[in-house]
Regions:
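A conserved beta-strand-loop-helix scaffold within acyl/acetyltransferase catalytic domains
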Residues: 1-107, 147
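Conserved acyl-CoA
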Residues: 116-128
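Residue-level preference for non-acidic, small/hydrophobic
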Residues: 37, 115-118, 145
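Conserved acetyl-CoA-binding loop-helix of GNAT-fold acetyltransferases
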Residues: 107-119
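Active-site/acyl-donor-binding loops of N-acyltransferases
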Residues: 1-3, 129-168
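Nucleic-acid nuclease catalytic cores
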Residues: 94, 102-108, 127-130, 134-138
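Active-site scaffold segments
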Residues: 88, 116, 133
Length: 168
């Protein structure tokens, strides 16, 4: 998180989502979260394996973990759940395992907002890193991760800094 400066569009995303309230919860799956998860998967990844997950599969993803894991729920002021992030607590940072959100809010960049929230949270906790999670550089659906500079990737030679989005 050191050296990260949000871009103009990221600052706009923070402003547009300023009504969203985040709360950290134990890694416990709820029907409300699962309902949002299903809507998200059907809208964003209908051909993916996760789209066919039932509640027990979702519960396993959330609760069966060998590390300290928690859920961040993001709600509108009315209390409506609009995004969820499954997050691992590591000794040196936070790791974004998976996030999902209400598809009709896509115009407000909820995925970016959730990442920015985690970066701010890592900074407030004095943690040096926020791990964006698994990344396939050739996947258009994962291309957004390259916007969060400075960025490091783990390769067979260790951690390597990327100098720009173009070096991906």
């Amino acid at each position: 998180v050191e050296g990260f400066t949000p871009s103009k569009s990221m600052r706009r995303t923070l402003r547009r989502n300023s009504n969203i309230i985040a709360s950290q919860k134990q890694a416990f799956a709820t029907e409300e979260q699962y309902s949002l998860f299903k809507v998200y998967e059907q809208a964003r990844h209908p051909d993916g394996e996760m789209a066919s997950m039932d509640f027990n599969d979702y519960r396993s993803m959330v609760e069966d973990t060998p590390v300290e894991t928690f859920i961040i729920e993001f709600r509108e002021g009315s209390g409506r759940l609009v995004a969820v992030a499954l997050t691992d607590q590591l000794s040196d940072g936070l790791s974004g395992v998976y996030k999902f959100y209400t598809p009709e809010r896509a115009v407000l960049s909820p995925g970016t907002f959730v990442i920015l929230w985690h970066i701010e949270r890592a900074i407030s906790l004095g943690l040096p890193f926020f791990y964006l999670g698994y990344w396939i550089a050739q996947s258009p659906k994962m291309a957004y991760k390259a916007r969060f500079m400075p960025l490091e990737i783990l390769t067979e030679t260790g951690w390597n800094k990327l100098r720009s989005e173009r070096s991906v």
